[in-house]
């Protein structure tokens, strides 16, 4: 007996087109284009999950550097001073402090300066 793929193919196409929702034009409506775009989008998603970590670290460093320069230090000397002063705050917290509570950041910068002068 011959087995036809009608139901299976329809289900597979439907599942893939459902995943392609939100794509533009034929990349949403046509199975082959949708399949190609979906594969590409999964590659982008995989790559960018890793890149997001690098991007946030860069952003934090830029923010810390800007705040450190307001306190007469550059980023590398500021971080070195923190290490000498045994202040263990990560870059995410430091960047948040630089943005939302500059007075606290200034106190930490002063501690960093003091550790550098010793």
Curated annotation (Swiss-Prot):
Keyword Nucleotidyltransferase: no
Family annotation (InterPro entries): Ribosomal_bL20 (IPR005813), RIBOSOMAL_L20_CS (IPR049946), Ribosomal_protein_bL20_C (IPR035566)
Gene Ontology, cellular component aspect: ribonucleoprotein complex; ribosome
GO BP annotations listed: ribosomal large subunit assembly; translation
Recorded superkingdom: Bacteria
Keywords for this protein: Ribonucleoprotein, Ribosomal protein, RNA-binding, rRNA-binding
Gene3D superfamilies: 6.10.160.10, Ribosomal protein L20 (1.10.1900.20)
Keyword rRNA-binding: yes
GO molecular function terms listed in the Swiss-Prot or TrEMBL record: rRNA binding; structural constituent of ribosome
Family affiliation: Belongs to the bacterial ribosomal protein bL20 family.
Function, as annotated: Binds directly to 23S ribosomal RNA and is necessary for the in vitro assembly process of the 50S ribosomal subunit. It is not involved in the protein synthesizing functions of that subunit.
NCBIfam families given in the database record: rplT_bact (TIGR01032)
Protein name: Large ribosomal subunit protein bL20
Provenance organism: Sulfurovum sp. (strain NBC37-1)
The organism's taxonomic lineage, starting at the top: Bacteria, Pseudomonadati, Campylobacterota, Epsilonproteobacteria, Campylobacterales
